[in-house]
């Protein structure tokens, strides 16, 4: 650039005030933030993040990811390692700073688009005016001029078509479906509500699962929370009064139930309900679902000993079915142990003596046992007093759910409103001619047919040549 060019730039900057420069910058930034391309890109990025949050287990320990997503050997998808997951925050996608930033950026984009585009379009639709000269209608592609006896018949046709008609002298303005201009605004507001509800749930809620024996209690305060959670769990506890399973005739599980009580710190029962699958207990914003079950323990009496409670552990059955078992010492020398196995809470077990040092069975066949019925094993009298069920309760608190539901309900309303066409019609009567023009924002063909039908209904027939000559002779 020569000296003349530099001098021109210098003079331009000197004569351009800083307020104007900042105004232009703000305008460009606002235009970019409110652009459709940015909004679509943000939607796609949020969708991709949500897929990652669905595929990758959330809220697990570092050891879990180190074990399931190793950084050597069989790497998942070739690049998804535990280091990759932890460094990008994919273990808590919906609470990560970048996911929150995407939501805030999308919310900003929708807000700017609403105020810069949708609201001005709504105001423009409401700020109508009469056209007074036929030439003013020439800017509309859909226009015509017909012989008529005035504007009255067309006004009647428009009212019959559910248009709101305004008349002044020989001028008409008619409109229908203005509420359709409100639809996009309602959609934007609903999306903002959904995102707000998602963020409230992410930072104000918690979710976990507890395995509890019948008769025991668990404290909501002990629920493991995310490191970014702002929620304060309640101080009441939950007592499992009873747990039982309904079985089908073939022995398969039909349904399982937990009788739960919500207990205050003072020991007062605040709420009680028997929950089952798809029938949770909801109290104080916390939902408790019946999620799983297990055989937690069994109670036995050996000869004249007191009742012993022995915990059960899940084991691998030969046929792949669920089973629980435990081995207990059965003699003083430690040469015999008794393996106890059950497949559920139906009340039956199999007892198998074996040598814990060699793993060899003491005798060939296992001894079946039933709850409450004595059985003899190697000369010892043994009674299984009870099989104690263990219930799996999923605990979830999400204060953002009502906001999300409200957002989705509003979204349905907004989408329905957006499908309504906003149609406008102008008419001017001059010198026996009715000049008509119209426009719509959607359903163009249907609007054209409607307008053609109304115009044809009010058009007066042109006089035939013979009638015109007769009139001239008279």
From Swiss-Prot:
Keywords: Cell inner membrane, Cell membrane, Cytochrome c-type biogenesis, Membrane, Transmembrane, Transmembrane helix. GO terms for biological process: cytochrome complex assembly. Signal peptide: none annotated. It is found in: Cell inner membrane. The chain crosses the membrane at residues 36-56, 96-116, 182-202. GO terms for cellular component: plasma membrane. It is a multi-pass membrane protein. Belongs to the Ccs1/CcsB family. Required during biogenesis of c-type cytochromes (cytochrome c6 and cytochrome f) at the step of heme attachment. HAMAP family: CytC_Ccs1. This is Cytochrome c biogenesis protein CcsB. It comes from Gloeobacter violaceus (strain ATCC 29082 / PCC 7421). The gene is ccsB.
């Amino acid at each position: 650039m020569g000296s003349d060019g530099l001098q021109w730039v210098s003079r331009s900057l000197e004569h351009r005030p800083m307020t104007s420069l900042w105004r232009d910058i703000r305008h460009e930034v606002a235009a970019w933030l409110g652009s459709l391309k940015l909004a679509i890109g943000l939607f796609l990025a949020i969708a991709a993040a949500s897929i990652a949050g669905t595929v990758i287990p959330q809220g697990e320990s570092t050891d879990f990811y180190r074990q399931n997503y190793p950084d050597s050997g069989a790497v998942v998808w070739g690049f998804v390692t535990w280091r990759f997951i932890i460094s990008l925050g994919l273990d808590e996608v919906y609470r990560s700073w970048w996911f929150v930033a995407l939501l805030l950026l999308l919310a900003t984009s929708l807000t700017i688009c609403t105020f810069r585009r949708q609201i001005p379009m709504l105001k423009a639709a409401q700020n109508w005016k009469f056209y007074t000269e036929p030439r003013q209608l020439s800017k509309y592609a859909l226009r015509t001029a017909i012989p008529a006896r005035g504007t009255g018949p067309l006004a009647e046709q428009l009212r019959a078509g559910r248009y709101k008609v305004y008349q002044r002298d020989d001028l008409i303005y008619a409109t229908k479906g203005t509420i359709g201009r409100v639809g996009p605004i309602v959609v934007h507001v609903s999306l903002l509500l959904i995102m707000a509800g998602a963020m409230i749930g992410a930072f104000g809620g918690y979710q976990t699962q507890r395995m509890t024996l019948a008769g025991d209690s668990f404290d909501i305060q002990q629920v493991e929370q995310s490191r970014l959670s702002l929620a304060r769990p309640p101080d009441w506890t939950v007592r499992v009064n009873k747990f039982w399973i309904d079985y089908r005739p073939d022995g398969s599980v039909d349904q399982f139930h937990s009788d739960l009580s919500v207990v205050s710190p003072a020991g007062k029962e605040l709420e009680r309900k028997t929950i089952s699958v798809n029938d949770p207990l909801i109290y104080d914003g916390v939902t408790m679902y019946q999620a799983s079950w297990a055989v937690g323990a069994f109670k036995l009496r050996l000869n004249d000993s007191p009742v012993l409670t022995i915990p059960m552990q899940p084991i691998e059955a030969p046929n792949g079915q669920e089973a629980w078992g435990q081995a207990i010492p059965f003699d003083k020398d430690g040469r015999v142990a008794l393996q106890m196995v059950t497949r559920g809470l139906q009340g039956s077990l199999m007892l198998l003596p074996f040598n814990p040092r060699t793993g060899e069975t003491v005798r060939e066949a296992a001894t079946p046992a039933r709850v409450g019925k004595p059985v003899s094993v190697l000369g010892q009298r043994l009674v299984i007093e009870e099989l104690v069920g263990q219930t799996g309760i999923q605990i979830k608190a999400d204060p953002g759910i009502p906001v999300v539901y409200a957002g989705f309900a509003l979204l349905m309303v907004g989408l329905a409103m957006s499908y309504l066409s906003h149609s406008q019609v102008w008419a001017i009567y001059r010198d026996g001619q009715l000049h008509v023009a119209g426009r719509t924002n959607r359903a163009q063909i249907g609007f054209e047919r409607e307008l053609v039908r109304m115009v044809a209904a009010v058009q007066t027939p042109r006089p035939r040549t013979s009638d015109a000559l007769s009139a001239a002779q008279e």
